[in-house]
C-alpha cells in the first residue's frame, strides 16, 4: 500500500519562455512532477526544454524536493528534448540517485537505443537503468 501520496508540479520549460530556443509565452506550460509516496520520491520530467540543465529556475525547484529516482525524457538527436549529455547534466544537477529514460520506444521514426543513453552516465553519480517496455520495476529492491 502506498499510504498517502503527494504530487508536486514543476516546470519543464522556463515559465517566461526562452528567446534563444524561440520559445515565447504562453508556449511554456510544459510540466513535470515530483511524486512522493511510501518514502520514495520520483521525478517525472515531462517534456523538458533541451537546455533544462542550464536553467537554475528549472533545476533548483526539482532538486529542493530531493527526488530519489528520475524518469527523464531525452533524445540523442531531436533538439526539442535534452540530448543524452544534457540528460546526464539534468540528473547530476538535480541530485538523482537512479535514472531511467523516458520516450524511448514511443515513436517509430524517432526511436533510439536506451543503452546508448545509459553509456553516457559517469561511474560516479546517478545509476542509470532501463525499464523494459510494457514492464515494471519495484523500487528500490528491483535495482
Predicted regions mapped to residue ranges:
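Binuclear metal-ion centers of metallo-dependent hydrolases, dominated by the metallo-beta-lactamase
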Residues: 1, 56, 61-63, 84-143
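Core dinuclear metal-dependent hydrolase active-site scaffold
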Residues: 1-60, 64, 136-143
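Loop/turn elements at helix/coil->beta-strand transitions in domains of secreted/extracellular proteins
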Residues: 5, 39-41, 66-70, 95-97, ...
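A short, flexible beta-alpha/helix-coil linker loop
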Residues: 14-15, 77, 105-106
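Short, solvent-exposed loop/turn segments at secondary-structure boundaries
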Residues: 19-23, 82, 111-112
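Active-site neighborhood of phospho(di)ester-bond hydrolases with catalytic His/Asp-centered motifs
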Residues: 43-50, 69-76, 99-104, 130-133
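Short, solvent-exposed loop/turn segments at secondary-structure junctions
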Residues: 52, 79-80, 108
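Generic structural signal for short, solvent-exposed loop/turn connectors between secondary structure elements
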Residues: 77-79, 85-86
Amino acid at each position: 500500500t502506498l499510504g498517502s501520496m503527494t504530487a508536486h508540479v514543476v516546470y519543464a520549460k522556463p515559465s517566461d519562455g526562452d528567446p534563444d530556443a524561440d520559445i515565447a509565452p504562453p508556449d511554456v506550460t510544459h510540466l513535470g512532477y515530483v511524486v512522493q509516496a511510501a518514502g520514495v520520491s520520483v521525478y517525472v520530467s515531462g517534456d523538458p526544454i533541451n537546455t533544462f540543465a542550464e536553467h537554475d529556475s528549472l533545476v533548483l525547484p526539482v532538486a529542493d524536493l530531493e527526488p530519489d529516482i528520475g524518469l527523464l525524457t531525452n533524445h540523442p538527436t531531436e533538439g526539442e528534448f535534452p540530448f543524452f549529455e544534457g540528460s546526464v547534466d539534468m540528473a547530476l544537477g538535480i541530485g538523482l540517485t537512479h535514472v531511467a529514460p523516458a520516450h524511448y520506444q514511443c515513436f517509430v521514426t524517432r526511436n533510439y537505443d536506451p543503452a546508448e543513453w545509459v553509456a553516457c552516465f559517469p561511474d560516479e553519480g546517478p545509476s542509470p537503468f532501463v525499464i523494459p517496455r510494457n514492464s515494471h520495476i519495484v523500487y528500490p529492491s528491483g535495482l
